[in-house]
């Protein structure tokens, strides 16, 4: 398991939050750009999260553990009328996304660089249209499964912040985590799995850009599952 994936855990984040030394330009984005984009949990959250964005956005999408930010940036460019909130505690990954935000002048992204559960508890009820949890740390050893981000308590958080009819998308190349997520969502009762055939969960999401973890899984001979749930 990589240190980056280890940093993206469940109720708290385990492992180090910084890897290789940052280059000067990356340090600049962390010190000067991140404070402009970071959500301040000490402030009172707006009832309508579109107020967080200078861009004219109409819906809100949350990605937890965005890694290098390839998917988040792709979706932000693809959907300029959607406001994106990205959560990633790993400093090097945050620096990569910030470089893209600066280069592409993306105005529809806001960020949080700590425990995602803190942000989820801050968000107003029914304020999010879509949540992405893509290739989260699988914690493959059974004794560590309780550390997985998908849990009863975190699904309750998702259900609280998602609007009725909102989407929760989960992708993983680890079969036990896919089954774990299906079982937890079924037990919760507030999430409807949309699949009607195997092709529905074997086929990547529309306009899917791929991720580094997906590519690694393919090289190692593992296929991925792409689950979509609707918040009841």
Curated annotation (Swiss-Prot):
GO cellular component terms listed in the entry, alphabetical order: tRNA methyltransferase complex
MF term (GO), any: tRNA (guanine(46)-N7)-methyltransferase activity
Binding-site list for S-adenosyl-L-methionine: 63, 88, 115, 137
Record: residues binding substrate: 141, 173, 211-214
Pathway(s) annotated for this protein in UniProt: tRNA modification; N(7)-methylguanine-tRNA biosynthesis
SUPFAM superfamilies per the UniProt record, alphabetical: S-adenosyl-L-methionine-dependent methyltransferases
Record's keyword terms, sorted: Methyltransferase, S-adenosyl-L-methionine, Transferase, tRNA processing
EC number: 2.1.1.33
EC category: transferase
Superkingdom of source: Bacteria
Catalytic activity: guanosine(46) in tRNA + S-adenosyl-L-methionine = N(7)-methylguanosine(46) in tRNA + S-adenosyl-L-homocysteine
Catalytic site positions: 137
Keyword Transmembrane: no
InterPro entries with a match to the protein in the record: SAM-dependent_MTases_sf (IPR029063), tRNA_(Gua-N-7)_MeTrfase_Trmb (IPR003358), tRNA_methyltr_TrmB_bact (IPR055361)
Function: Catalyzes the formation of N(7)-methylguanine at position 46 (m7G46) in tRNA.
Family: Belongs to the class I-like SAM-binding methyltransferase superfamily. TrmB family.
PANTHER family xrefs: 3-DEOXY-D-MANNO-OCTULOSONIC-ACID TRANSFERASE/TRNA GUANINE-N 7 - -METHYLTRANSFERASE (PTHR23417), PENTACOTRIPEPTIDE-REPEAT REGION OF PRORP DOMAIN-CONTAINING PROTEIN (PTHR23417:SF14)
Protein's name in the database: tRNA (guanine-N(7)-)-methyltransferase
Organism per entry: Agrobacterium fabrum (strain C58 / ATCC 33970)
